[in-house]
Amino acid sequence: MALVTKNVSFASGNRQLEGFFAQPEGEGPFPGLVVIHEVWGLTENMRYWARRFADAGYAALAVDLFTGRSKAICMFRMMSGMLLNSLNHQGIADLKATLNFLEAQPSVDRERVGAVGYCMGGSLAIAWSCADNRLKAIAPYYATNPKPQEALKRLCPVVGSYPGKDFTAKHGQQLDIALDQYGIAHDIKIYPGAKHAFCNEDRKNAYNQDAAEDSWERVLAFFGEHIQSKATV
């Protein structure tokens, strides 16, 4: 599929965020997707995922939450905010601003939007969804759950992928139980033998092609049901 890609910049409060936007050629409207990066920031791997989702029919925006700031300081602030008050910190505010920008694009159907996040980005996707009802579905990868855990009852549908050889596996198990309890549509899978960052081909010691491709197919199917199939209002 032919794609349109561009670098973008937009406001979040009194600062500017940057990102990489990819969508299929044409006017749309396309379902929108925010791609949230790992602790490494907006890398070429995150741009790859934005392009891959665009090739599947989405208008995808990979945001750089570390724009113009020290990566180490941003990582510390993000993780501290998630641990201490995970539903009210700068990362969530920046993601809301990112979705505002995405929804403002004429090619995007604002009634069909979701998010995918990896590592830190997956944890942020879960926390963000608890605080923003615009999201129709999210796909966290090797993510942790927000506090308090009761916040999970406000989640949208979730398709989560977790490596068996990682501390986040227990978070996936807890999320599965909570979503069952709250009656929220979900598909949580733990991949035995897989390691943290199993979807990142740049992490040669962690990449697991079988887990990466299986999770990709699961995410596409789940998003197809909960995002793409939603009627445009």
Residues of each region from the PLM?
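Serine-hydrolase catalytic machinery in alpha/beta-hydrolase-like enzymes
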Residues: 7-107, 199-203
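Short beta-strand/loop motif that positions the catalytic acidic residue
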Residues: 159-162
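Acidic catalytic loop of the alpha/beta-hydrolase fold
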Residues: 164-170
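Primarily recognizes the serine-hydrolase "nucleophile elbow" in alpha/beta-hydrolase
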Residues: 96-155
